[in-house]
């Protein structure tokens, strides 16, 4: 079956999910991102790869961090950037998604960065855009958030280059997390031998083992001999009903404290896709501690998004 993210000759056309992306393309994105890391240190933080191109950030769902890093990434590539907060624009007046897309296409946009609360929205848009337009999924419902998954993997690779001897633990609200799915698909494709998920049963999707992960419900047991600890935000806004007794109870069992982190390897790194709930899924002593690479993740996010945009622009037919 043809992958809708790829051109007929196997190049990247859209970035919608890490699921099903060939290892060669994942490595191409990570290697290209490596070349962009130094751009932020230059006096002139620009490269001309997207000069003359227009990138539209279309956010049907709010996100300060993701929107800002995509904006910075596009501007560092010298693109013209339009940011549309659709919740306050024509959508709220009854315009459909396709109307919005058609209007932006008529303005000769070249790339759409789309965030939407509905799973599958980015795939839907990619199916309906003009042939010259590239679509990047900036998060769709619970489904996928590929650039976040890739920037997490990029961060892991910088601190732990030997991906074939790694144990990674993803901890927390896996059920509602599009980041967890994107990250797990990327890690397993890149050959990481052991990915664990640690969560209460109520916060795990059905048949999660099919993703190729080992499931743990006890934090201390799950963190034993781990190299990378990825904490997930407790997503209160996506929860229906009482999946948890209380935030305090959750922190007691699944919050990452120095005491729990001691079960991982002494040189383990701690990650979080943000925004953090301090005192819910992570203790401040850990978030601000020497094993935390949470702020470098944000920095690398710009390089990874620059890489994705430049590869897509280079693959224009």
Swiss-Prot record:
Key word Transferase present in the record?
Answer: yes
Q: Which reaction does it catalyse?
A: carbamoyl phosphate + L-aspartate = N-carbamoyl-L-aspartate + phosphate + H(+)
UniProt keyword annotations, A-Z:
Pyrimidine biosynthesis, Transferase
SUPFAM superfamilies registered for this protein in UniProt: Aspartate/ornithine carbamoyltransferase (SSF53671)
Query: Enzyme class, one word?
Result: transferase
Q: Look up the EC number in the record and give it.
A: 2.1.3.2
On whether Ligase is a keyword of this UniProt record, the answer is no
Q: Which residues bind carbamoyl phosphate?
A: 65-66, 115, 145, 148, 274-275
Biological process terms from the Gene Ontology for this record are: 'de novo' pyrimidine nucleobase biosynthetic process; 'de novo' UMP biosynthetic process; amino acid metabolic process
The record ties this protein, via InterPro entries, to:
Asp/Orn_carbamoyltranf_P-bd (IPR006132), Asp/Orn_carbamoylTrfase (IPR006130), Asp/Orn_carbamoylTrfase_sf (IPR036901), Asp_carbamoyltransf (IPR002082), Asp_carbamoyltransf_Asp/Orn-bd (IPR006131)
Record PANTHER family: ASPARTATE CARBAMOYLTRANSFERASE, ORNITHINE CARBAMOYLTRANSFERASE, MITOCHONDRIAL
Sorted alphabetically, which NCBIfam families does this protein's record hold?
A: asp_carb_tr, PRK00856.1
Recorded family membership: Belongs to the aspartate/ornithine carbamoyltransferase superfamily. ATCase family.
- Relate the assembly described in the record: Heterododecamer (2C3:3R2) of six catalytic PyrB chains organized as two trimers (C3), and six regulatory PyrI chains organized as three dimers (R2).
What protein name applies here? Aspartate carbamoyltransferase catalytic subunit
In the record, what lineage is assigned to the organism producing the protein?
A: Bacteria, Pseudomonadati, Pseudomonadota, Betaproteobacteria, Nitrosomonadales
